Amino acid sequence: MSDQDGKKPLGLSGGARSGRVNQSFSRGRTKSVVVETKRKRVMVPKPGAPSAAAQNAEGGKRDKSVPDAEMDRRLKALQAAKARESQEAEERVKAEREREEERNRRRADAEAKEREEREREEALKAKEEEDDRRKAEEEARRNAPPEAAAPAVDPAAAATPRGGGKAAPARREPERDNKRENRSRGNDGGGRRAGKLTVNQAMSGGEGGRQRSMAAMKRKQERQRQKAMGGSVDREKVIRDVKVPETIIVAELANRMSERVGDVVKALMNNGMMITQNQPIDADTAELIIEEFGHRVQRVSDADVEQVIDTVEDDEGKLLPRPPVITIMGHVDHGKTSLLDRIRQANVVSGEAGGITQHIGAYQVTTESGAVLSFLDTPGHAAFTSMRARGAQVTDIVVLVVAADDAVMPQTIEAIAHAKAAEVPMIVAINKIDRPAADPQKVRTDLLQHEVIVEAMSGEVQDVEVSAMTGQGLPELLEAIALQAELLELKANPDRAAQGAVIEAQLDVGRGPVATVLVEKGTLRQGDIFVVGEQWGKVRALVNDQGDRVKDAGPSVPVEVLGLNGTPEAGDVLNVVETEAQAREIAEYREQAAKDKRAAAGAATTLDQLLANAKADENVRELQVVMKADVQGSAEAIVQALEKIGNDEVRVRVLHYGVGAITESDIGLAEASGTPVIGFNVRANAPARNAANQKGVEIRYYSVIYDLVDDVKAAASGLLGAEIRENFIGYANIKEVFKVSGVGNVAGCLVTEGVARRSAGVRLLRDDVVIHEGTLKTLKRFKDEVKEVQSGQECGMAFENYEDIRPDDVIEIFEREEVERSLT
C-alpha cells in the first residue's frame, strides 16, 4: 500500500472526478478515454450584493444588444404602468370611501326616520293617555261629593313644590336610578344605541319588547271616531239568491254569496270536509253552506244552458205553407239518382263514382205548375244505412224506387222499415218500365209481403210506373207528390229563429267545415249565430244547391252553411241563438256531456269483463286501418261496413277515421300501428306524401265503396289460417308382426283399398278405435324400400316411435292439404 500513500480512499461521495477512464478490450488490451462532464452552473449572489432586477432598475449593467430607443420605450411603458396602477388604486379607495359614506348616510336617514316615527308614536300615545287621564279626572270630579272636592286638590298641590324645597332632590333620585338602570340594560343588549334612553323606554318603564305599531294606533283611532259618530251599529246582512249548479268551486261559491273565501273554507272544515278553495263540491254540500250563511238557494242544472233555445210552439196565425221534403229511397242501381236527374233536368249520375250515389244529395225543384219541391237523394248501398235513416227522419214524403226488372231487394226492405219508423207517407215509383224484362205486377206482389199495399191492389199507397231514361210517367209522379203534400197541409213559421237538421257535413280544404242543412223552421240568415251538436258558429255564407250564394234560406230549403268552428255529426240539429256566448256555452256543455257519457260507459266495464275480453281477443287477429273520407256520412258508412267484416278469427278495426285530407299525423299514427291509410274521395297533402314515402306507409285511394270493402275483405282473408283438409288414400290390414333388429316391430300388411305412400300420415285402428296417429318409419316390398304400394299388394310397414302392433289391426293412410280460406 506504499504506492497508495497520500491518496484518498474510494467512496460513494468523493472529491472531483478524474477526466480520464480506462476502457478494457478483449485479450487484455486497455485504452485511456477522456471524459467530459457537463454541469449546470448555478449563480449564487454574494451576501450584500444587489439583485439583478435592482441592478437593472438602478441603471446597472444592461444588455448591450438592446438599442437605446427600445430601452427608453420599455422604461416609459413601465413608468406608465406604475402610474396607471397607482391611479386605479386611488380610484378604488375613493369609490370605497364614497360607498361607505353613502351607507352611513342611508343608515343615518333610516335611524332618523325610525326615531321620528317612534317619537310621533310616543307623542300620540302620551296624548291619548293625557286625554284619558283628563276624562277620568273630569268624571271623578263630576261624581265626587262637594265636600270632598277641596281635599282632592291638595295632593296635586303638594306634589308641586313652589319654593324649591328639599323635596326636589328626593323626587329626582328615582329618575337618576331609572336612567342608570336603563343605561345598564342598553349596555347588556350590546346594540348600537346602548346606553341611550328613548321616549319609548321612558314611557314603557324600561320593559323593552315590541310595542304597538303605527297602523294599530290608526285603527284604534278610527274605531274611536266611528264609536263617537255612532257607527258601531252592525250593518244589516244582505240575503242573496245563490244559484247552485250540480258542482261548483268553493271560491266561486264564496263569490256568489259575497262572503270571504276563508269563512267558507272554515265552515266546510267545521262540517268535517277538508277542502281548499280551488276544489269542487256537490250541490247538496253547497246548499248546506249557503243556508248556514243565511242566503237562499236556487238549484240549477247544467242542462239549463239549453233553455235559451227557442222551443215554443208557433202561433197558428203565423204559419205559412212550405214546400214538401221528398226523400228518394231504394236499392242500389234501381235508378234513384237517374230519376231525380230527369226531374231536375240535370246530370248527377255522371259525377258519381261508378254511377253510385255515395252522399245525401239535397236539391230543390220547381215544377211546371210552379210548385217547389225539395228532394233528398239517399244512397242505396248496404253501407249507407245510417244515411237512409237520417233521410227518413227529416222528410215529409218517401218515394220508394223499385226496378221493374229486379223487384224487391234488401235495401228496398230496409227503406220500407225506415219509412214506417219515421211514420211518413210513401209513394212507390216502379222504375225501368221501358226494359223488356220489366214486370211491374211482380213488384206490387212482392211489396205485399212487407205490408205495402198499393192502390192498384185496393191499398192506400200510391204507385206510379216511370222510366228515368224516357221520362215516361214523370208528370204522374209529380202530381202524386203534390197531392200527397196537399193532404199533409205542411206549414211553418218563417219569422222565427231558424231550426234545421244537418244532412251532411264535410271538411273542405278551402272553405273549412261545411254542413248541408235542411231548414225546418224559421229563416236562416247570413250573420246568424247558431249551435249545432257539439259545434257552434256564425253563418259566414249560405250556398244553395245550384252553387249560388244566397242571403237567407226559409223552411224546407237545403243550403250549405259556412262558418262552423268544427265539423258536426250528420243528423245534428241546428238552432239559432242570440249571442255568441250562449252558443259557446251550449256547445261546451254538450261536448262535456258526451265525454262524461263515454267515460261512464268505459267505467261501467268491470275488471272481470276486461280480463274476459282480453282472453277472448287472444285468438282473434285484427286488421287495423286508418280511414279518411270527404264527408261525415260516408266516413260513418264505411266504418260500419268495415266493422261488419270478419268472423271469430279475424276482424277489422278502424283505429281512426275522420273528414278531410290525409295529414302527416294520420301517417304517424299508421306508422306507429303498422296499418295502411285509406282515402275515400280524398288525397294526401304534400307533407303526408313525403312522410309516407320516408316511413314506408301504404296509402290507398278509393272512390267507390264497393272496391274499398272488397279490398279490405281480401286483406282480412289473408289473416285467416289455412284450412287443413285430410284426404283418405288407402287402408291396409295387418296379417303378421315381425321383429326386425335395428328397426323394431314390422307389420306385414295387405293393402285392401287405395294406395299406401311412404310420405303419408297413418292411423292405427284397433276394433275401429284410433289408438295411434303418426308417420311411417319404413315401407318395404320384398326387402326393397318403396315410395308407395298399390291396392292388393303386400308390404311391410313400421311406425315411427311406436311398437304396439298386433295382427288384425287396420292401418288408415291419409294425406293433409292446406286450403286457403276467405271471408264471405
From Swiss-Prot:
Region annotated G4, chain positions: 431-434
One annotated GO molecular function: GTPase activity
SUPFAM superfamilies, alphabetized: Initiation factor IF2/eIF5b, domain 3, P-loop containing nucleoside triphosphate hydrolases, Translation proteins
InterPro entries noted in UniProt: EF-G-like_DII, IF2_assoc_dom_bac, IF2_II, IF2_N, P-loop_NTPase, Small_GTP-bd, T_Tr_GTP-bd_dom, TF_IF2_bacterial-like
Chain segments carrying region G3: 377-380
Keyword Transmembrane helix: no
Residue ranges annotated for the tr-type G domain, each copy included: 321-491
Chain positions covered by the region annotation G1: 330-337
Keywords assigned by UniProt, alphabetized: Cytoplasm, GTP-binding, Initiation factor, Nucleotide-binding, Protein biosynthesis
Record flagged with keyword GTP-binding: yes
Chain sites annotated for binding GTP: 330-337, 377-381, 431-434
Stretch list, region Disordered: 1-234
Pfam families xrefs: EF-G_D2 (PF22042), GTP_EFTU (PF00009), IF-2 (PF11987), IF2_assoc (PF08364), IF2_N (PF04760)
Renumbered residue ranges of the record's region G2: 355-359
Principal localisation: cytoplasm
Biased composition (Basic and acidic residues): 59-75, 82-144, 170-186
Biased composition (Low complexity): 145-159
HAMAP family tied to this protein: IF_2_B
Function text: One of the essential components for the initiation of protein synthesis. Protects formylmethionyl-tRNA from spontaneous hydrolysis and promotes its binding to the 30S ribosomal subunits. Also involved in the hydrolysis of GTP during the formation of the 70S ribosomal complex.
PANTHER family: TR-TYPE G DOMAIN-CONTAINING PROTEIN (PTHR43381:SF5), TRANSLATION INITIATION FACTOR IF-2-RELATED (PTHR43381)
Family: Belongs to the TRAFAC class translation factor GTPase superfamily. Classic translation factor GTPase family. IF-2 subfamily.
Protein name as annotated: Translation initiation factor IF-2
Native organism: Jannaschia sp. (strain CCS1)
Designated gene of the protein: infB
